Amino acid sequence: MAPWSHPSAQLQPVGGDAVSPALMVLLCLGLSLGPRTHVQAGNLSKATLWAEPGSVISRGNSVTIRCQGTLEAQEYRLVKEGSPEPWDTQNPLEPKNKARFSIPSMTEHHAGRYRCYYYSPAGWSEPSDPLELVVTGFYNKPTLSALPSPVVTSGENVTLQCGSRLRFDRFILTEEGDHKLSWTLDSQLTPSGQFQALFPVGPVTPSHRWMLRCYGSRRHILQVWSEPSDLLEIPVSGAADNLSPSQNKSDSGTASHLQDYAVENLIRMGMAGLILVVLGILIFQDWHSQRSPQAAAGR
């Protein structure tokens, strides 16, 4: 077997002349940079990152962080913002397009912003979108109330006041249920010495069930929240008043018509019963009148 030699050593121009030094340098640079450029141009899709059962976790509860890449992934890394080293490294789970990172007991040290990467033969992927992992239960709960009234008419707006005597830098309003929406506002100091935020919500409708809580947090660790406020449910009144006059007139007319129809049926049934009674009496009298002569003849 012939000994291996660099491909550039076998390149000779037509005519047998030696390759110029400048051309040799360019060829060597092209050969050395070629594979590297191919890897960089691979454009690996970025990883996908999420948390189960969710990204807002009560203090002491467990959470699982999942990172998804491609089937060619050989390694997954979880990186926490502000940390110089990877938070954790995991081998992929079958079928190799996912990895699992577990936190058995959530603390303030786990709260923060995370991203993940995966490694494949083509190189490292792009980072995932950030995941905000929040821990709750580190401060006393704020209060949540509706202004100007806890009962809201359908179609109106309502202002939700989240407040506390504690010096929170911001308040977070969250919606319970399937929607799980959230809003964040900086806190304001009131003349009474309370910190609060006013959240405008609406217009509200009876078709949407409004159940909300709020939290407080401080600026140095924004992902560490207080205990949740008591649940606030907003009753929406005036649903029947939203009917148009034509609808109300139509409904009342229909009800009146049904009532008249029922009375007519009762009268007809009464008349039919009376006729049956009269017929019964007439038949009995006829039968009795025919029997009397027969009885007299028998004597």
Curated annotation (Swiss-Prot):
Keywords: Cell membrane, Disulfide bond, Glycoprotein, Immunity, Immunoglobulin domain, Innate immunity, Membrane, Receptor, Repeat, Secreted, Signal, Transmembrane, Transmembrane helix
Organism lineage string: Eukaryota, Metazoa, Chordata, Craniata, Vertebrata
Keyword Membrane: yes
Tissue: Expressed mostly in tissues of the hematopoietic system, including bone marrow, spleen, lymph node and peripheral leukocytes. Among leukocytes, monocytes and neutrophils express the highest level. Expressed in CD14+ monocytes, but not in T-cells, B-cells or natural killer (NK) cells (at protein level).
Subcellular location: Cell membrane
Identification of the protein by name: Leukocyte immunoglobulin-like receptor subfamily A member 5
Signal peptide coordinates: 1-41
Membrane-protein topology: Single-pass type I membrane protein
Name of the gene: LILRA5
